[in-house]
Design a protein with these regions (language model features):
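Phosphate-group recognition and catalysis centered on beta-loop-alpha active-site segments
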Residues: 1-123
Length: 123
């Protein structure tokens, strides 16, 4: 049996952030499940929902912002006051980090509201 950290160590840290992924690694899990979305300029970012309102300090949809714009978005969610600014990571940033450890990664492609034709090819 393998134990996966859902959205990283999301029970104690802001979900789908590099902090949550690092803490999941430190906890000894076997893998990480994460969610991806596509930005306005075609970059793959790690965030659960298509919309930003619930988990960030931005409003609207991920697909309406460029990566540059989203880099100033705080994905700290309910943990903002505890952990400060937590940027939305790119899938590339995650892959670079994950290449240095032995975690298994389960990528969930989110498309319940919008279909992203290129998302599968980019992940």
């Amino acid at each position: 049996m393998k134990v996966f950290a859902h959205r990283g160590f999301s029970g104690r840290y802001p979900q789908n952030t590099m902090l949550a992924f690092q803490k999941a690694l430190e906890s000894g899990c076997d893998g990480i499940e994460l969610d991806v979305q596509l930005t306005k300029d075609g970059e793959v970012v790690i965030i659960h929902d298509e919309y930003l309102d619930d988990l960030t300090d931005f409003t609207g949809n991920v697909r309406d912002y460029t990566l540059g714009e989203l880099k100033s978005c705080n994905a700290g969610g309910k943990w903002r006051e505890v952990y400060g600014f937590q940027p939305i990571p790119t899938f590339e940033e995650y892959c670079e980090w994950a290449s240095g450890n032995s975690l298994i990664t389960n990528v969930e492609i989110k498309s319940s509201v919008y279909y992203y034709e290129q998302l599968e090819k980019k992940t």
